[in-house]
Regions:
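Short Pro-Gly-centered flexible turn/kink motifs
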Residues: 146-162
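Generic surface-pattern signal
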Residues: 113-116, 122-127, 176-177
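Polysaccharide-binding surfaces and accessory modules of carbohydrate-active proteins
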Residues: 3-4, 8-117, 139, 150, ...
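Generic hydrophobic, helix-prone segments enriched in Leu/Val/Ile
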Residues: 1, 99-101, 133, 139, ...
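Residue-level detector of intrinsically disordered, flexible termini
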Residues: 80-84, 126-128, 167, 177
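Extracellular adhesion/glycan-binding regions together with long Ser/Thr-
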Residues: 2-4, 121-150
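Terminal connector regions
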Residues: 28-30, 161-179
Length: 179
C-alpha cells in the first residue's frame, strides 16, 4: 500500500510518501518513508517522528522497553543514554515487538509515560532518553534529514516486528540480515 500527501509549512512545500509492505504470512511490516521537496528553495531541518502514545501489546499495557542496536543479528541494549539506538525492544514476558530503522539518521526516543505524543516523545532528546523502563508508556523514533534541494528527496526504511517472545529474536535476526 502506498500513501502520498502534500504539505506546506511556512513557504516550504513537500510531498510525503509512505509505502507499507507485508506478506500474508509475515510477522513484520516494512515501511519506506520518503520526503520530496516540491518547492523552489531548500528544505532544511526536516524531521520525522514515528511511534505510539500507548505501548499496549498482547494482553498487557505495562511493558518493558529497551533501547539498543542489532549486533551480530541480535538485539543488544545500548550502554549509555548518549549512544545512538536504532532498535527498541518492547516485551511483556509473552509477546515482543521490535521497532527499528536501518537509517544512520534514526534515533529511538521517548520511553515516557502514556500520554500526548508531542510531550512524551517529540520533546524528549534521544541523548537523554531512558535506556530501560517498565511502564504504561509511549515511544518513538526520530529522524532529522539532510537538507533537501528542490526536486530532490530523502528516504529511510523502518520495521515493525510483532511475535511471541520465543520466536521474536530469531525473526529480528532474519529481518536484519535481509535488510
Amino acid at each position: 500500500m502506498i500513501v502520498i500527501g502534500r504539505a506546506t509549512i511556512g513557504t516550504k512545500i513537500f510531498e510525503v510518501t509512505r509505502t507499507y509492505n507485508q506478506t500474508s504470512t509475515s510477522k513484520y511490516t516494512i515501511f519506506n518513508e520518503s520526503i520530496k521537496n516540491v518547492g523552489t528553495t531548500s528544505l532544511t531541518n526536516a524531521r520525522v517522528w514515528i511511534g505510539t502514545q500507548d505501548d499496549w501489546i498482547g494482553q498487557n499495557d505495562s511493558n518493558t522497553k529497551k533501547r539498543g542496536n542489532i549486533v551480530n543479528g541480535a538485539f543488544s541494549q545500548i550502554p549509555s543514554a548518549a549512544t545512538q539506538a536504532k532498535v527498541l525492544e518492547v516485551t511483556n514476558g509473552t509477546d515482543t515487538v521490535y521497532f527499528y530503522t536501518t537509517s544512520n539518521l534514526g534515533y529511538i526516543t521517548g520511553l515516557q509515560r502514556y500520554g500526548d505524543f508531542r510531550t512524551q516523545v517529540m520533546n524528549q532528546s534521544p541523548a537523554t532518553a531512558q535506556i530501560n523502563v517498565t511502564n504504561d508508556g509511549s515511544y518513538g523514533m526520530y529522524l532529522r534529514f539532510q537538507d533537501i534541494a528542490p526536486g530532490a528527496s530523502e528516504s529511510f526504511t523502518w520495521y515493525y516486528i510483532a511475535s511471541t517472545k520465543a520466536s521474536a529474536e530469531a525473526l529480528l535476526g532474519n529481518v536484519a540480515s535481509a535488510a
